[in-house]
Amino acid sequence: MVISRKLMGALVVLGICAVAMSDVMAQQQTPRTLRVINYQGDMTLLLAAVSDAYGVTVGLELDTQPPRQVGVSLLDATLTDVMNAFVQSTKRYQWRQTGQFVDVWPLAGSNPLLETRISSFDVKDLSPSEAFDQLLNLPEVQANMTALNLKRRAPDASARNVSSSRFSVKLEGVTLREALNQIAKESRIEIWVFRNYPNGFFSISSVER
């Protein structure tokens, strides 16, 4: 399932003015900064804007509590600045960056399903939703879901399938989390959301770019 940003509200509430960067600076991999960030609102929307602004793919694992509102006010902020301010505001999450990927997960711990090892995943000309379905139907994922007594459910009513983008991806020897990151990157949805619910249920959705 894919959550359209239009359905989630206007991202313009995040007041961001990007600092211009020369080609030389880009080649030197100078950290990108945002001149002004003044945001108060849904945490998922903030992370969607972070993905756009800094050119990273975000993997968000939500705990069983309702997503909370966050407040971030920064000047000349790097990605690290924004993410540190985010976790300080939520007080329930932690984060890490690995190359172009930013992972966010609960302080209380991650769902072990996301660490399931996947031997091979090779799909062609699929939508993100179709790729999610095929990924979660892999034998190793299904076996781990059974062992952990987990069940997939549909995302909340605010989510619907809106993405028509098609893409292909081939992966070997990755975790479920890493596979979700690659799906998000290759399909350009840029952020996926794994939400934990009580009683062993979970959902996977994404935010379309």
Regions found by a protein language model. Name each.
Residues 2-209:
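N-terminal targeting/assembly segments of extracytoplasmic apparatus and virion spike/baseplate proteins
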